[in-house]
A protein has these predicted regions:
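Rossmann-like NAD(P)(H) cofactor-binding subdomain of soluble oxidoreductases
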Residues: 1-52
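Generic preference for well-ordered secondary structure
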Residues: 15, 24, 41, 51, ...
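Internal alpha-helical scaffold of NAD(P)-dependent oxidoreductase catalytic cores
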Residues: 32-105, 110, 114-155
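Residues that cap or flank secondary-structure elements
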Residues: 19-20, 73, 135, 186
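NAD(P)-dependent Rossmann-like dehydrogenase/reductase catalytic/cofactor-binding core
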Residues: 125, 133-203
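Helix-loop-beta segment of a Rossmann-like dinucleotide-binding subdomain
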Residues: 7-18, 56-69, 119-126, 171-181
Length: 203
């Protein structure tokens, strides 16, 4: 969830952030320097799941794992990974611009994940609360401003993105699950990365 450590590798945003690391995700660029972003292949994970106990995962819905190279090419290694996932019964589309999908998911993560963790509500319960929905819309509007500044195309509306999330019954996003389990929260990749980009680009 959130923006990956390799996000600006060959990103072509025409901003000063191209080919730099995100401090909020990768402090001092340690992952960038150690793993090298050329080794990265991006993946947007859509299934809604819950860890019931170690080794036991409850799958609520979803079977799509969108894949993409940071440079947007459809490489042989990308095709191979996609083929393996498809042969396993999953959907694994190969994307030339995975970053758009990363932001569509981030759109929900930065709002629903955080407010579910703060309120303890499931996604469908959030959909029934006008006050929370109003706050979610405002958060998504701010996220969209930042994304568009670095070339992201939001091909669905805020209302449709909200409908998609709140249609999932009885599910709490991973941030709320982590909070309830006493695990570290993924706040920096989900929220901190957006704030960092906004500050660096004076948005």
């Amino acid at each position: 969830n959130g923006l990956p450590w390799w996000y600006f590798h060959e990103a072509k945003t025409q901003t000063k952030l191209d080919n730099t690391h995100l401090e909020s995700v990768d402090p001092k660029g340690k992952i960038w320097k150690t793993l090298n972003p050329n080794s990265a292949i991006g993946c947007v994970v859509y299934p809604a799941c819950e860890i019931l106990e170690p080794g036991i995962i409850k799958h609520t819905e979803g079977d799509r794992f969108s894949l993409g190279e940071p440079n947007g090419m459809i490489s042989e290694r990308l095709k191979e990974i996609s083929s393996i996932l498809i042969d396993s019964g999953l959907k694994a589309p190969q994307k030339k611009n995975l970053r758009d999908e990363i932001w569509i998911k981030l759109w929900g993560n930065c709002s629903f994940n955080i407010l579910s963790a703060l309120t303890g509500s499931t996604l469908d319960e959030i959909g029934e609360n006008p006050a929370i929905l109003n706050l979610i819309k405002k958060m998504m509007e701010e996220c969209k401003l930042v994304g568009e500044e670095i070339g992201i195309k939001f091909r669905v509306s805020i209302d449709d993105r909200i409908k998609g999330a709140t249609s999932i019954q009885g599910h709490k996003p991973s941030t709320a699950q982590d909070l309830e389990a006493g695990k570290p929260l993924e706040i920096d990749p989900i929220i901190g990365s957006i704030i960092e980009i906004g500050k660096k680009l004076n948005i």
